[in-house]
Amino acid sequence: MKEKEKLIIETALKLFAQKGYNSTSVQEIAKECKISKGAFYIYFPSKEALLLSMLNYYYDKTFTRILNIKTKGDSPRTAYRKQLTVLYENILEHKDFISMQLKEGSLPYTEEVEQCAKKIRQSSLQFHIDSLLNIYGKKAEPYTAELCFLIEGISQIYLECMILLGYTVKPSQLADIIMNRIDDMVKGMSERNDKPFITLEEASSLFGPLTHGRPDPLTESIVKSLRDKINSLNTNSSLELSESLDILEAEMKKKTPKLAIIKGMIHNLTESEALAKDAEQLKYLLKQQHI
């Protein structure tokens, strides 16, 4: 993303948080950025396009930070605690983004915005699901969807207290609090043999496919990026790279993927300078998913 685009996004975000999306004009955003209205439209064809870019920008930024945390050698619990800490740090660093979403009637309910929000929620839920199953195993399996909703709900209330009411809690402390609450919920639900309020299948019908081991939306977006870049290459190795990605995708979808094949195909992709960065990021994401 170009620096000017980042400037427009971050400036618009502050204005949306202060005045609301509907009450902020393109002219005001341009003026605050010290650019002309015409220059604004060079980067974004409409205010709605700006909003979609804004949502995707902060989504990618947040999950990239989470997935770049060093967790090698950590237990699943320690890794999840680190990831929650960074998640909360990122949210608190971007209070304007949260304020914009909390402002009543701030965001337009268009199909594009709804799909973007659905993608973000799906990715967030899948992140929690994989972590819960890695930590608690079969004990949490019947309750994964319900636990995700409870984690998101509790986190939101606590973060609103910190952002709107001035409660001072370190992100690491909040992560500890949430982990303790999860322990209590898993223990209580499993010991009572509760019937889940919502199943994983029901949650999938609302937010898109949610399963243990399914590639998360960020992984899928990197695979798509690799595919697009391979298709745009005009080299003798394009066919071989395309075949490597085909084999990699097929192996990732298996219930028990073979690590040697995964490593081999990613190695083939990293040999291309144009694909190396995406391939390395994909390698890291798959490690995080214990593939």
Swiss-Prot record:
Entries under InterPro entries matching the protein: DNA-bd_HTH_TetR-type_CS (IPR023772), Homeodomain-like_sf (IPR009057), HTH-type_Tx_Regulator (IPR050624), HTH_TetR (IPR001647)
PROSITE patterns from the UniProt entry: HTH_TETR_1, HTH_TETR_2
Keyword flag Ribosomal protein: no
Keyword DNA-binding: yes
Disulfide bonds: none
Recorded superkingdom: Bacteria
Keyword annotations: DNA-binding, Repressor, Transcription, Transcription regulation
Gene Ontology CC: protein-DNA complex
Gene3D superfamilies: Tetracycline Repressor, domain 2
Domain HTH tetR-type residue range list: 2-62
The entry's DNA-binding region: 25-44
GO molecular function terms attached to this record: DNA binding; DNA-binding transcription factor activity
Coiled coil stretches, renumbered: none
Protein name: Uncharacterized HTH-type transcriptional regulator YuxN
Organism per entry: Bacillus subtilis (strain 168)
Gene assigned in the entry: yuxN
